[in-house]
Each structure stands twice: as C-alpha cells, then as structure tokens.
Amino acid sequence: LDMGHMVNNIKQIDEFVNLGSNAIETDVSFDKKANPEYTYHGTPCDCGRDCLRWEYFNDFVKALRTATTPGNSKYDKLFLVVFDLKTSSLYDYQASEAGTKLAKNLLQHYWNNGNNGGRAYIILSIPNLKHYKLITGFQQTLKDEGHAELLDKVGYDFSGNDDIGDVQKTYEKAGVTGHVWQSDGITNCLLRGFTRINAAVANRDSANGIINKVYYWTVDKRQTTRDTLDANVDGIMTNYPDITVEILNEDAYKKKFRIATYEDNPWETFKE
C-alpha cells in the first residue's frame, strides 16, 4: 500500500490519489462529548507540510464516500483509509462512547446506512492501548444497528509504538482476532531505526502472532523507501506517494511488490 499521509482536506484526496496513493491516512479530532468533529492535525506536524488543513468530519466522510463508490474515477485506485483517531483529547472512560459515535457517523455518512455506500476498507488507528474499548464500542454499535456485515470492511491499529507483546494482549482484551494492522514510525523530521518494525514483521510471520499487515511511517526519502521495502512491510505511509511508485518500479522491487487493488484482501497475511 502506498499510503498518503495527513489527508485532511477534501481537495487533498484527489491530489494524493493522482500521485499514486491507493490508501490515505486522515486525522480525526473529537469534541468534548467524544463526537468526531474535524479532520485536522494541527501543529506541529511533518516537516514541509501545512499542518492546518481541515474539514468538518461529516463533510470529509461524505466526499470520501463519493470517491470510493463505483462509477467515480478514483474508485478503482483508492481502496483503504486509515482514520488516525486523536483520542488523547478524551478521558479514558470516553473511549467506548467515541467508538459508538464514530460508528453511527460512518454508518450514516460513509456507508449510507448500508445502501450503496463507500466501498473502501477502513482502519481505526488508536494511539493509546488504554482506549481499546473504542473498538468494542464501534463493533457493538454496528451490530446493534443491524449492520454487523460492515465490520468485514474494518481493521484495527494501535499507533503508539508500544511493545508488540502488550499490543497483542490488548487485542485479546478487546476480543479482536483478525483484521490487525501494525504501524511503526516517527515524523519525517526525525530518524527511526527498524528494530520494532522487524519485531512487528516477525509477529506477522509467526504461527501465533496476531498481526496481519505492517506499515511504516513517514517515509519520504528514496533510500528510506528502499530500506523499508527491504524490511518486508505491507505498506508505506508517505508525504510523496510518487516517490514510492518510482522505487516500486526499480528492478530490485518490481518483481516482489506491487500496488494493491480491490482484488486484494487487506486482512489476509501474505505468504511468499
């Protein structure tokens, strides 16, 4: 996956897809009552990026639905969206409520109440292991609303760079047994080693690991892109998706990697 980083403004959906992104990451901020309010990152953010682009969450999600509905020119290209849920503004006890409100919002504005809504896969990316009840609240709400089938399109990620063993235990608490993506990374302003990404890949490839896919962020330089592919990741999050496309076309990588499409299953671990 060539994942466009920090896509918080409706115009940027086109911009990143046109540069080659088949997935985007969008920041979601919450109000005091745990309602998803804006797609907004704020300062500080990645070097070389405008941190202040934003939309109302509902408006962004409706535009996303249009972009990922058959018949739209972007439909074939954009097949996965990571919602980077900025839950640090909430109290821990609000996590479940945030999950409920997010589910109701997406059900209405993205999935169109199950009636020919957006088709992209959705990843709920949560920065704090303590907020795992966001997942259970989200799942229960879709079940209560009679749309458990939409959970087939939803996956999970804890983005806090926690110990992989602790992440696995947290999923056990949440009752999650699949659809698990694992991120690792740091802002493009700083360098980060590959120790933890290697641990995540090892968990993915082991018989008893819970991880299905691994992605690394934020990768903007050509050499870092090569190093990341050499670590055998499934996704690269970047501010420059065209650089990822360029490197994937190099002889060393074009036989081993390709850009994923709707024919692929993002919850299935790739076996060589």
Swiss-Prot record:
CDD domains: GDPD_like_SMaseD_PLD (cd08576). GO terms for biological process: killing of cells of another organism; lipid catabolic process. The lineage of its organism: Eukaryota, Metazoa, Ecdysozoa, Arthropoda, Chelicerata. InterPro entries: PLC-like_Pdiesterase_TIM-brl. This is Dermonecrotic toxin LvSicTox-alphaIC1biv. Disulfide bonds join C45-C51, C47-C189. It comes from Loxosceles variegata. It comes from the Eukaryota. GO terms for molecular function: lyase activity; metal ion binding; phosphoric diester hydrolase activity; toxin activity.
